[in-house]
C-alpha cells in the first residue's frame, strides 16, 4: 500500500501511568479525544522497550484526566504496578477514519515533502505538537521544521501518492 496509512501498523494511543486501587486496575493516560475512547480499543498491545504483551480490556471508565481500566489476568495492585510505563498501542485499522482534511500523525510519517517548485525537501520523520499547530519534522539534506498549517504552508496532502506539497523556500 502506498504511503504509511497501512492498517497493520501499531499506533500509540496511551500510556499506563500506574495502579488504581488494590484489585489490579491500571490507570492510563489517554492520547485519544475524548480520553475514554481508549477503553473501546481492543485488544491493546502493551509495549516498553523490547517487551510486548497483549492486554484484553474487560472494562474501564474515565477518572479525572485519565482512564482506569481492568485488564484480563491483572488481579493485584502489584501486577498493575508492573505495567507502569508501558505504551498502549492498537492496530491502525481500529481507529475511525479521520474527517476530510484531517490526518493521523502516523499517516504523515514517511511521506515525501516537495515545495511548489517540485524541489524535494525530504521525508516526514516525526510530527511534533506545539500547541498552536503541529510541526512536520522533515529530514532531507538537513532537518527542517515546517508548520503544518493547511492552506498557508501545507498546500496538499496525498496519502495515496505518499506526498505533501508545501509553500516553503528550500533555503529555509
UniProtKB/Swiss-Prot annotation:
Keyword Cell membrane in annotation: no
Entry GO MF terms: ribosome binding
Gene Ontology cellular component terms for the protein in this record: cytoplasm; ribosome
GO biological process: ribosomal small subunit biogenesis; rRNA processing
A Pfam match: PRC_RimM
UniProtKB keywords: Chaperone, Cytoplasm, Ribosome biogenesis, rRNA processing
Chain coiled-coil ranges: none
Record localization: Cytoplasm
Main localization of the protein described in the UniProt heading: cytoplasm
Entries under InterPro entries matching the protein: PRC_barrel-like_sf, PRC_RimM, RimM, RimM_N, RimM_N_sf, Transl_B-barrel_sf
Residues of the PRC barrel domain: 100-172
Disulfide bond residue pairs: none
Family: Belongs to the RimM family.
Free-text note regarding domains: The PRC barrel domain binds ribosomal protein uS19.
Function: An accessory protein needed during the final step in the assembly of 30S ribosomal subunit, possibly for assembly of the head region. Essential for efficient processing of 16S rRNA. May be needed both before and after RbfA during the maturation of 16S rRNA. It has affinity for free ribosomal 30S subunits but not for 70S ribosomes.
UniProt protein name: Ribosome maturation factor RimM
